[in-house]
Regions:
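A short beta-loop-alpha structural element at the N-terminal edge
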Residues: 6-20
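Conserved GNAT-fold acetyl-CoA-binding loop/helix
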Residues: 19-48
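A short helix-loop-beta-strand connector motif used in the catalytic cores of GNAT acetyltransferases and
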Residues: 47-59
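Conserved beta-strand in the GNAT
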Residues: 59, 65-73, 81, 86
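Conserved beta-strand-loop-alpha-helix junction that forms the acyl-donor binding cleft
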Residues: 89-92, 118-129, 145-149
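Conserved acetyl-CoA pyrophosphate-binding loop and the N-cap/start of the following alpha-helix
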Residues: 91, 95-103
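Conserved active-site alpha-helix within GNAT-family acetyltransferase domains
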Residues: 98, 123-141
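Conserved GNAT acetyl-CoA-binding A-motif
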Residues: 108-121
Length: 165
């Protein structure tokens, strides 16, 4: 019998595994846009450590290995910015990303008072867009990242997370 994937709050000890996983997972996004300077690939380990310490960060574990991660924080306007959702390439397509997203939504709404959730993804990232739309997110606009990538902005009301959980 194989091990099952568990979702839990990230700890300080997870930061290095999150950092490495993020670098691996976002290679395909970088290739999609021909841009290897996207934020997840240039973020420092110290910056990941700071996010784990201050933001709402969840990991998916298979045994002791971190195989997925997501981060979120409530912004000044009461929205929760959710980002850097990633799942190890060998485990994608098994619902781990959706589970991580639901865990972040629940914590951000219940523990940090988020009224709505917001996330951004590149305009060519069809797999990401499918996941987010299946999870109840709707496109509310577009912007351009500091790295030059055209981004789609998606949102949903915090009350809606329970319906997709």
């Amino acid at each position: 019998m194989g091990m099952s994937v568990t979702i839990s709050v990230a700890t300080e000890q997870d930061a290095e595994q999150i950092f490495r996983l993020q670098y691996l997972c976002f290679q395909s996004e970088a290739a999609l846009y021909g841009n290897y300077r996207i934020d997840p690939l240039v973020q420092t380990l110290d910056s990941v450590r700071q996010e784990v310490a201050s933001d709402c960060v969840f990991v998916a574990r298979l045994g002791e290995e971190v195989v997925g991660s997501v981060r979120g924080k409530v912004t000044e306007d009461g929205a929760a910015a959710i980002g850097k959702l990633c799942v190890h390439p060998r485990l994608q397509g098994h619902g781990i990303g959706a589970r991580l997203l639901r865990a972040a939504e629940a914590a951000l709404a219940e523990e940090r008072g988020a009224k709505r959730f917001r996330l951004l993804t590149g305009h060519r990232s069809e797999g990401n867009l499918r996941l987010y739309r299946r999870s109840g997110y709707e496109t509310v606009g577009r912007s351009r990242g500091a790295d030059g990538v055209e981004l789609i902005i998606l949102e949903k009301q915090a009350g809606a997370y329970a319906a997709t959980a």
